[in-house]
UniProtKB/Swiss-Prot annotation:
Name the UniProt record assigns to this protein: Probable cytosolic iron-sulfur protein assembly protein Ciao1
GO terms for biological process, alphabetical: iron-sulfur cluster assembly; protein maturation
PROSITE patterns found in the cross-reference section: WD_REPEATS_1, WD_REPEATS_2, WD_REPEATS_REGION
GO cellular component: cytosolic [4Fe-4S] assembly targeting complex; metallochaperone complex
Originating organism: Drosophila sechellia (Fruit fly)
Keyword annotations from UniProtKB, A to Z: Repeat, WD repeat
Function text: Essential component of the cytosolic iron-sulfur (Fe/S) protein assembly machinery. Required for the maturation of extramitochondrial Fe/S proteins.
PANTHER family, sorted: CYTOSOLIC IRON-SULFUR PROTEIN ASSEMBLY PROTEIN CIAO1-RELATED, WD40 PROTEIN CIAO1
Length: 335
């Protein structure tokens, strides 16, 4: 069994902290929360400290933040129904674009692998795809409305321009651009959860997806492409996603976030029972029937709900978490 070792506990935000995001280089991260501010933290020696506070971009809670793949831009999604784009072109971070269009709170934001596309989703049940049209210019490429409820999360595929979204309607949906007419379409609906799907994340090559839900389970989904050797039918030559594993019994309350480490293959969960749990694929796992085991759990990782967890993209086994308790914690997993 592994261990989750606490390395740092950080404070600075007022109120609950909703989101944390590692910079692609892994030596800086950003945090956001109820206080309408974004904090950018960096490591000096062995001490993490706030380097910058961005407090003039939003009028309400900031729900999520994400760095662009190049690390030059930061996008923030807010309950004020806008998404702000920040960059450091002049030496200091400033808000260079504000994306408007959603009718209600923006819940999530995600950059595509190339950084040329941005996705947002909202309580208004819609998913928007934006194209980067030039310096600080973004054009709406699609407004997608297949969900019947609040959309909680959007995440781009790590190697393709394929988008996944998770919703209060208990489903996950996949979107891709039709090559003929360049229209964005919903290409798959993933149904198995029995309550809100809070979080989703792809594995390193994007052939599998993990989801977490209010139903206290995590599920592993596998992509079956046209011509697959497993004999899974693919109507209309579209990739089919099947739930190949359900992990249940470890969480006592809603699971709010899940992160699939691209370096180690470990899965981390953030739970409403104040805990963080780490899962690993077993050595005898089969492609069409994978099995995962919990290798460690920190039951009282925070004093209140854990809202977000994210693996460091560079430092293997380093995990960051944030909570309603107003703290950010940095952990190290030892297997």
């Amino acid at each position: 069994m592994g261990r989750l070792i606490l390395e740092h506990t950080l404070q600075g935000h007022k109120g609950r902290i909703w989101g944390v995001a590692w910079h692609p280089k892994g030596n800086v991260f950003a945090s956001c929360g109820e206080d309408k501010a974004i904090r950018i933290w960096s490591l000096t020696g062995n001490t993490w400290g706030t380097k910058t506070i961005l407090s003039d971009g939003h009028k309400r809670t900031i729900r999520e933040i994400r760095w662009s793949p190049c690390g030059q831009y930061l996008a923030s999604a807010s309950f004020d129904a806008t998404t702000a784009i920040w960059s450091k072109s002049s030496g200091e971070f400033e808000c260079n674009a504000t994306l408007e269009g959603h009718e209600n709170e923006v819940k999530s934001v995600s950059w595509s692998r190339s950084g040329g596309l941005l996705a947002t989703c909202s309580r208004d049940k819609s998913v928007w795809i934006w194209e980067v049209a030039g310096d600080d210019e973004f054009e709406c490429a699609a407004v997608l409305n297949p969900h019947t409820q609040d959309v909680k999360r959007v995440v781009w595929h790590p190697t393709k321009d394929v988008l996944a979204s998770a919703s209060y309607d208990n489903t996950i949906k996949m979107f891709a651009e039709e090559p003929i007419d360049n229209d964005w379409d919903c290409t798959a609906t993933l149904t198995s959860h029995t309550s809100t799907v809070w979080g989703i994340d792809f594995d390193a090559d994007g052939e599998r997806l993990v989801s977490c839900s209010d139903d206290t389970t995590i599920k592993i989904w596998r992509a079956y492409h046209p011509g697959n050797t497993a004999g899974v039918a693919t109507p209309e030559q579209q990739t089919v996603w099947k739930c190949v594993c359900t992990v249940s019994g470890q969480h006592s309350r809603a699971i709010y976030d899940v992160s699939w480490c691209k370096l180690t293959g470990l899965i981390a969960t953030a739970c409403g029972d104040d805990g963080i749990r780490i899962f690993k694929e077993t050595s005898d796992s089969k492609p069409d029937e994978p099995t995962f085991e919990q290798i460690t759990a920190e039951e009282g990782a925070h004093d209140q709900d854990v809202n977000s967890v994210q693996w460091n993209p560079v430092v293997a086994g380093q995990l960051i978490s944030c909570s309603d308790d107003g703290t950010i914690k940095i952990w190290k997993v030892s297997e």
